[in-house]
Amino acid sequence: APLTQHVSKEQRFRCHSQTSRQDPLISNWIHRIDTQYMPSEAQRDVLVLLPCSARKPYSRSQSHRFFRSAIRNRSVHQVIVTSPLGLVPRELEEQWPAAHYDIPVTGDWDSDEIDTIQRMVSNLVNRVGYKRVINHSGIEFDLDVETIDTRAEGVGASSKSACQTLQIAIDDAVEQFNLENIREKELLKHQFSALSMWQFGTDEWLQDLHVGGKPPRWLLLDGKQQMAQWHPDSGRFSFTKSLLPKLHSTGTLPVVEIGGDAPWKGDIFSGMIVSAPIDLKVGQEILVVRNDTLIGSARSLAAGWEWQGGVGRLAKSQHRL
């Protein structure tokens, strides 16, 4: 599995050859989307498939601004069709490597790319149970659900006529399936839950929280108290000290045990480690315990295998309780 969970916004993953498709980072993404990923329950009726863009995240591109103006209901689930990742759900577009890969956008697909995308879409549709698929990607699909193609052959996806056709198809689906246009912060809560499931395998820690603040760094609040903040540039949540006990009790973050009797000061070094998960990733948030007591949090600077008998600094401290 990939050894890094988060990277700086400047980092790029270059996909300029077919061999890049074999990279563990790519195969891990495809496997998870293909077999595990589920959208929020609020977005499981209508799926719209959109083409990718050279600019990442996609929503910052001109073409996707056109698409989003045509998709006027937030209950419609947007998924971007791309290579080599196959599919990128809108709520995951700020994740590594979806926000960082660099590939020439030619509009031409080889048979392997098409086969991968068609398989992934079919698996996603069958697993989620969408009632209708609106296909604006330009790729043909043979699905066991009603599919509406909104791009005429040879017509650009972001052209005025194509976007009008897309908007008509969306509006028709909204009316036919009586889709409620959920509020922005309600949608954000659903999307943060999906992001939490993707990153941590659970969203229990945020179930009682609500979204506040202003874009792009939204806050997750308990009443008026900030518990977490979303950082879109790095695709991560930052947690406040007061949330650590809940993150621990819900099993959200991996746990590292350190030894010694002196007060914990500074960062975490190899000589301090009693135990650590073997699958830790660079950039991953971890909880720190001593003698079965939670004492703080840190951010991993090394992959899990380096924690087993390695040397040097392994994690940067974040909070102390």
Protein language model features and the residues they cover:
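Active-site and ligand/interface coordination hotspots across diverse enzymes
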Residues: 2-68
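Short acidic, S/G/P-rich loop/turn micro-motifs used as interaction or catalytic elements
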Residues: 54-59, 85-89, 104-115, 139-143
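Well-ordered, non-membrane alpha-helical segments in soluble/globular domains
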Residues: 58-70, 106-123, 162-169
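Short connector loops at secondary-structure junctions
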Residues: 76-100
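Extended, charge-rich low-complexity interaction segments
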Residues: 99-133, 178-205
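Peripheral docking tails and interdomain loops at the edges
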Residues: 139-185
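Anionic-ligand-binding alpha/beta catalytic cores of soluble enzymes and soluble regulatory domains
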Residues: 175-252
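Beta-strand/loop-dominated core regions that host nucleotide or nucleotide-derived cofactor-binding catalytic loops
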Residues: 227-321
